[in-house]
């Protein structure tokens, strides 16, 4: 929805996060300027991709964000992951505002909140072998040896319905459903506290969907 707004974008006041939630979203907004305001004159025109959204994600719970196509679900996910900067609002992780976290705090947040994206074709680096794609988080965020990482990668591939011997292949050698399973294996590598998923089983065969959901 595109609307005309004043130059000033109102910022909703922050509300304290829930004590029971691992993630709290408060008054979150993401507005994109799509016109107007030329040379500082006139009203700017904004596309309100996300407008005043608030919710809590409790520990050890499954939380679903449901809405029609184009209503802002994927943008909300990107804001949660720090891939987009909010126009206004707050994102809390374990009670702490992510925007004001220390460097160490943000590193812990990135380790603890992983993602699986909807498009398995663009979410994997085509120049990397699967063993590197799945093992990269372990190389960066742990002190595991190469042998331990290789074992962990094999286990993750098995758990997501892939053959560990496929670790030496490249993404283009897999089907779309298999690529999505690689993305899920990568997201599970660090045993995260939160996994944010953008329609994660939409590209999978019916026979594998239940297996993946049970694994998650």
Predicted region positions:
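Conserved ABC ATPase "signature" region
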Residues: 97, 147-165
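Conserved ABC ATPase signature
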Residues: 170-174, 178
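Hydrophobic anchor residue at the start of the ABC signature
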Residues: 184, 212
């Amino acid at each position: 929805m595109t609307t005309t707004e004043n130059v000033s974008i109102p910022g909703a006041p922050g509300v304290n996060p829930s004590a029971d939630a691992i993630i709290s979203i408060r008054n979150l907004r993401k507005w994109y300027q799509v016109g107007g305001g030329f040379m500082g004159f006139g009203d700017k025109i904004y596309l309100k991709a996300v407008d005043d959204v608030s919710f809590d994600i409790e520990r050890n719970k499954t939380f679903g964000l449901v809405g029609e196509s184009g209503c802002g679900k994927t943008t909300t996910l990107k804001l949660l992951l720090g891939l987009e900067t909010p126009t206004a609002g707050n994102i809390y992780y374990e009670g702490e505002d992510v925007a004001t976290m220390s460097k160490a705090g943000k590193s812990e947040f990135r380790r603890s909140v992983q993602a699986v994206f909807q498009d398995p074709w663009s979410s994997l680096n085509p120049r990397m072998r699967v063993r590197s794609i799945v093992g990269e988080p372990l190389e960066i965020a742990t002190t595991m040896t190469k042998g331990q990482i290789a074992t962990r990668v094999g286990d993750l591939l098995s758990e997501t319905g892939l053959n560990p011997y496929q670790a030496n292949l490249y993404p283009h050698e897999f089907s779309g459903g298999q690529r999505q399973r690689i993305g899920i294996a990568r997201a599970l590598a660090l045993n995260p506290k939160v996994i944010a998923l953008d329609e994660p089983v939409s590209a999978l065969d019916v026979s594998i969907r239940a297996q993946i959901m049970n694994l998650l």
